[in-house]
Amino acid sequence: TLSNGLARVRRNGKFGLIDITGREITPCNYQFIGQFSEGMAWIEADGLAGFINKKGRLTISCKYKWVSDFKNGLALVGTQDNTKGYININGLEYWGH
């Protein structure tokens, strides 16, 4: 489906993004690409999650066990050791104590 002028495509079991003209924005390198929220879409690569922007650039590295969509500038994230925290769209992490 088309979201923000981009469509998710799947080739050889991996996901990527194309624009409305069919031009590749992100190669099919990801296990999954979520919907865009606040200009960011979560992705999964090698079992870990991160985020790309609408230009298809990896903006937050795939280092989290799980992530949520961005809402009000923050996304909830979880680490391999089950620590939960938040990140902003620049990747700045906020961890609870």
Functional labels for PLM-detected ranges:
Residues 1-97:
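Residue-level detector of conserved, function-critical positions
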